[in-house]
Amino acid sequence: MVQFAWPHVKTFLVLIQARKLSISVLRNRGVWIFGLSVLLMACSQVGKVSTTSPIQPEASSNRKIQTGHYSKKFSIAAANPLATQAGYDILKKGGSAVDAVIATQMVLGLVEPQSSGLGGGSFLVYFDGNSIRSFDGRETAPELADPNLFLNSKEEAIKFIDAVTSGRSVGVPGTLNVLALVHKEYGKLPWESLFTPAINLATNGFLVSERMQILLKKDKYLKNDPVAETYFFDESGKPWKKGHLLKNPEYAAVLRLISKHGSKALMSGEIAQAVVNKVQNQLTSPGL
């Protein structure tokens, strides 16, 4: 049985909690894809991008306005340079935009777990220059969910932050399923090869970003989870500083299973059971 050090049930396992979602635009060889967390485009034109303040509990780490970049063949951008590099390398190997999205997303789940992860959900819009296809990969409520899920014993609504940080906010993830679906139709490189960048980073370690350090410092609830506390904070209880080498061999183990067995490895079997156990044994308010 694989042991899972999921950083945070409300962020890494499942993003069903009004967290900030990055709108993605991808283009490679005439194909545009709009999704979550990743941005690729073969740029002939770049429009203005507007952002809004993220809904709590994820704190803002501010934003910077910089001069845009242009490319004749393709370009890629993501919320973390390591994720961007992973997608870029896939494109250089002849991979499709969809291939690059998958590699980038797997790295984002490691280096930016507060905003992205295997347990999240996504919308994806695919445009090849002639037609548009939309894919719904958002989370769904657990089978046992009912209208009283977020009510207390007095039939009063639970406070938002209490609900979000509890096991009750966890839904059935959809991101991996939708990525598997679009890869089947539009992928070029083997599915297994797309997980190598994230597996290597999780095994060998990555440097904590300034954004992660800032958000860890602002998060008031992360230490409520012993596993998350051990992973994100040092022995004195302080968040890892920018530049700290952080490893996650458990995440690498999960990705290896998914790379070999597809999205079903997350939705059933030992990984799924580990998620269910985590949710149902959440310390303050267990979920379904």
Spans of model-derived segments:
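N-terminal secretory signal peptides that target proteins for export/translocation
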Residues: 1-27
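Sec-dependent signal peptide recognition
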Residues: 29-34
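C-terminal motif of bacterial Sec signal peptides marking the signal peptidase cleavage site
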Residues: 41-42
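Residues that scaffold, gate, or flank divalent-cation-dependent active/transport sites
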Residues: 46
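Noncatalytic scaffold domains of N-terminal-nucleophile
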Residues: 50-85, 89, 97-261, 266-268, ...
